[in-house]
Amino acid sequence: TPKTLYWSPQYLSIAKFIGDSIILPATLKNDSIATCQLGEIAIENKGNGHTQGKVLFRPEQFSLAKKIQDPTASFKGEIKRIESRGRAINICIDICGYELNINEDLINEYHTDEQVTMYLYGKGVFYND
């Protein structure tokens, strides 16, 4: 289905082709957890028995807003840049040395150098390629 193709493609190369992605080197801890630059992350394992690989996220999995559903993980970060995009803003946040760019609605006011909590919703997908 299109949903599966976007959220859980069989191969990382397909994931890169179909939309924006965040890809980080990762080490498989067990069948459902990988460790990457952001820390330990719940994953769907498509590593085919490998323990070294990459974990894929979609940018929309990250948010500064706490939603109705419980987040899978949360991270402390610092806002590095803010770019206005009409009714939304693009925010660059440094989390453990990784600069993550997300789009947020203009509901809240954010400032450069502000310490924030970033929430991850859903799992990453672990690949060996």
Can you name each region flagged by the protein language model?
Residues T1-I41:
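Internal alpha/beta loop-helix hairpins
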Residues S21-I23, D31-D129:
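Non-catalytic connector elements of ABC transporters
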